[in-house]
C-alpha cells in the first residue's frame, strides 16, 4: 500500500523528469532501509564464564539482535550491566530463553527484570523456561514485582525438540542436551527472505513501484500489453537464511546432530580442554575438542566456544584444540564481543 500511495503522489505533483528522480530516490531509500533490517542478525556476548565466580568472565548470557528485536539466551548475574556496556536498548527485549536451572544461567533474572520495572517498562515480557523454573520465578516475581509496570509471561518448554516461538522473521526450536539437570538448547532460524529487485530491469519494463513488494515475494509482472515478464528477469535470489544453534551446558552428545542440521553458526560450551576430559564427563560438560566434533557432526559453518572454566588464564588452547577437529571458523566468546552472524 505504501508503494502505491507514493507512486500516486509523485504522478500528481511532479513533472516527468522530477518524477524519475524522486522515483529512483524513494526506491533507493526504501530498499536500503528494508535490506538493513532484513540483514541484521547480530550476537552480543554478555557473559561466557562457567559457574565459579571469576574476575575474567561473567556468567552465561547472550543477546541476539534480529532485525532490531532482542532475544536473550540465558541470564547470568548482572545481565543488566552487560546490556548497558553494549548500549543495547532494554525496551527492545521481549523474550528471554533459559536453558536450565543452574544459577549461572538464570540468577540474573531478578535483577534484570527489576531494572526493567525501574525503567517503567510497559510491554509484556515472555520467559521461555521449563516448568520447574516457571514455578520458582513466578513466586519470586509475584512477591517483588507484584505491582510492577509490566506483565511477565511464562512459556513452558518441554524436554523434546519443538518450536517454541515464531514470528514473521524467525522460528526458535528447543532441543535436548545432556547435563546433570534437564537442559535445552535453542535453534534460531530465519524464515526465507525476500528476493532482490534489479533496479535497471524494473525501470526498463516500467514496473510501478507499488508492485515491488509482489516482485520480492516472487510474482511475475504483466505489462499493459499483457506480456508476462518472469520474476527472475526482474529480481535476483534472496540472501541465504541464517541459523544459530545455542548448546548450553552439555556433555559430549552426538544426538545434537539429529536436531541441529547445517547451522550457519553454533555456540557450544567448552568448559575444559582435553587435559580435564574425565572431569568434564563427570560434571556433564564438554571439552573444546568435543565441541568441535559436535560442530562437525552438525555440518556447522562456524563455531563459537564459551563457558570457560575459571582455572584457565587464557583461552587460546581452547581455540587450537577445536581447530584440530573442526574445519570451519572457530571463535572464542568474550564479554563485549559482537558478531555479525550474516558474515
Summary of predicted features, one role per range:
Residues 3, 7-10, 15-72, 199, ...:
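Zn-dependent metallo-beta-lactamase
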Residues 38-86, 122-124, 186-188, 237-247, ...:
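Conserved beta-strand hairpin/beta-sheet module of binuclear metal-dependent hydrolase folds
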Residues 77-128, 155-158:
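Active-site metal-binding motif and surrounding structural segment of the metallo-beta-lactamase
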Residues 121-125, 130-158:
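Active-site neighborhood of divalent metal-dependent phosphoester bond hydrolases
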Residues 157-305, 316-326, 342-343:
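Metal-dependent phosphodiesterase/nuclease catalytic metal-binding core
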Amino acid at each position: 500500500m505504501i508503494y502505491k500511495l507514493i507512486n500516486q503522489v509523485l504522478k500528481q505533483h511532479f513533472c516527468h523528469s522530477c518524477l524519475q528522480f524522486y522515483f529512483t530516490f524513494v526506491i533507493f531509500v526504501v530498499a536500503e532501509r528494508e535490506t538493513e533490517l532484513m540483514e541484521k542478525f547480530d550476537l552480543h556476548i554478555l557473559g561466557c564464564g562457567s559457574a565459579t565466580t571469576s574476575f575474567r568472565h561473567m556468567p552465561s548470557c547472550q543477546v541476539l539482535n534480529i532485525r532490531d528485536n532482542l532475544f536473550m539466551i540465558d541470564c547470568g548475574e548482572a545481565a543488566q550491566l552487560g546490556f548497558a556496556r553494549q548500549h543495547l536498548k532494554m525496551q527492545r527485549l521481549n523474550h528471554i530463553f533459559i536453558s536450565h536451572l543452574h544459577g549461572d544461567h538464570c540468577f540474573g533474572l531478578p535483577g534484570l527484570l527489576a531494572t526493567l520495572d525501574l525503567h517503567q517498562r510497559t510491554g509484556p515480557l515472555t520467559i521461555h523456561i521449563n516448568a520447574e523454573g516457571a514455578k520458582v520465578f513466578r513466586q519470586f516475581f509475584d512477591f517483588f514485582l507484584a505491582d510492577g509496570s509490566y506483565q511477565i509471561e511464562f512459556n513452558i518448554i518441554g524436554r523434546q525438540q519443538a518450536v517454541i516461538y515464531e514470528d514473521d522473521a524467525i522460528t526458535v526450536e528447543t532441543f535436548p542436551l545432556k547435563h546433570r539437570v534437564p537442559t535445552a538448547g535453542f535453534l534460531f532460524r530465519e524464515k526465507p527472505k525476500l528476493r532482490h529487485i534489479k533496479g535497471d530491469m524494473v525501470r526498463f519494463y516500467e514496473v510501478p513501484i507499488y508492485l515491488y513488494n509482489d516482485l520480492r515475494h516472487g510474482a511475475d509482472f504483466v505489462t499493459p500489453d499483457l506480456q508476462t515478464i518472469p520474476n527472475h528477469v526482474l529480481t535476483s535470489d534472496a540472501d541465504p537464511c541464517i541459523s544459530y544453534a545455542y548448546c548450553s551446558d552439555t556433555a559430549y552428545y552426538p544426538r545434537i546432530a539429529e536436531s541441529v542440521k547445517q547451522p550457519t553458526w553454533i555456540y557450544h560450551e567448552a568448559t575444559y580442554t582435553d587435559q580435564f576430559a574425565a572431569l568434564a564427563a563427570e560434571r556433564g560438560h564438554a571439552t573444546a575438542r568435543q565441541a568441535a566434533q559436535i560442530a562437525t557432526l552438525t555440518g556447522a559453518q562456524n563455531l563459537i566456544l564459551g563457558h570457560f572454566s575459571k582455572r584457565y588464564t587464557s583461552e587460546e588452547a581452547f581455540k587450537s584444540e577445536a581447530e584440530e577437529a573442526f574445519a570451519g571458523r572457530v571463535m572464542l566468546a568474550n564479554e563485549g564481543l559482537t558478531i555479525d552472524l550474516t558474515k
